[in-house]
Amino acid sequence: MMENMKINQLPSKTWNWLKMNETAISGITVSGAHEIKAEIPAGISKTNCPAGLPDQFREVAGGMGPDMDVLVRESAAGAVLLSTDGDLAETPVRIGFTYGASEHSLNTFGIFAKEGSKMTVIMDMAAEADGASGADHTALSSVQTKLILEKDAEVTLVQIIRNDNAKTVLNDIGAKVADGAKFSVIHLFLSGDHVYNGCKADLVGKKSTFTADIAYTIGNDAVLDMNYVALHEGKKSVSEIKTDGVLHENSKKLFSGTIDFKKGAAGAVGNEKEDVLLLDDDVVNQTIPLILCAEEDVEGNHGATIGKLDDDMVFYLESRGMELPKIYKMMAKARIDAVLRLAPDEKTKADVASYLESEATNGRI
């Protein structure tokens, strides 16, 4: 079983002294799959795959890179395959995780959306209440999700990472998107000590689409390392990556966003936008946007806003009786809420809203 991994490698390397080309992690061991709770609606089939996902998923590359695939193979933890039976699954698939403070687990999922079908999958990665102190939390939670979207299929994947018990979180996504298909990711990063996330969408089809809406709040010395890649191969393919987050209390964030236009992707459009709010002076914010072009007839855009709260706004809110810590919490919650509203499931919205309220009450947001 591998213990050392290199993940989130950039497709095109930048200066080595920046130490942003890849991330090295160690002490990675898994002992099996976490026992999930799955709600499978009509129109969706769930198949357990003890030997791993079908061969067709091997061609799908994840955002964390090949070392994650090696970890999955060596773990022999099996996989779960979700596939559409009909054209439309009106109710979302809900997959719940409740992690303990010391488990080391890996779960693998395959999502196969047949031609013209639509489905939503919600993964809520939470922690069980065990009463252990943060110093006693040694858990590793790792999840890999690979998707194949056939022509005109639509898949929305919502992932909520709020595992307070995890010392390390690994979350890997890879998707292959055919003609006219649409793949949407909604990510909420709410807790976890060291969280590593990779997401790659291969837009192989004409007019295929990938959107990612990401929100995070990081504090208490936590680390969030994110790598998103939109690989444009199909003509007139479209990608949109939007990130909005808050850093405070000696936290660190690395965001790598790549829009890669391959030869033949004429008419493709890729957009990337990041907004970061820094609430303390001791935080570390790193961002590396990449736009790679092997095709002339394309459009790629990147924009970033990084800053602190406006002094006039703070003065106004304080003059209305709000204390500075409450102002910070309000701003952090507002950014999460803006992305949470995009989740197509009222139950999920209510659960996360309740969690955020509890975290704010306990002073953790």
Where are the predicted features?
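Long, low-complexity, mixed-charge
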Residues: M1-A77
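Conserved beta-strand/loop scaffold segments within soluble protein domains that form the structured core
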Residues: Q56-F315, S319-M322, A343-I365
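Extended amphipathic alpha-helical segments enriched in small hydrophobics
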Residues: Y316-A338
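A generic "cationic amphipathic patch" detector
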Residues: M2-I36, I95, D130, I160, ...
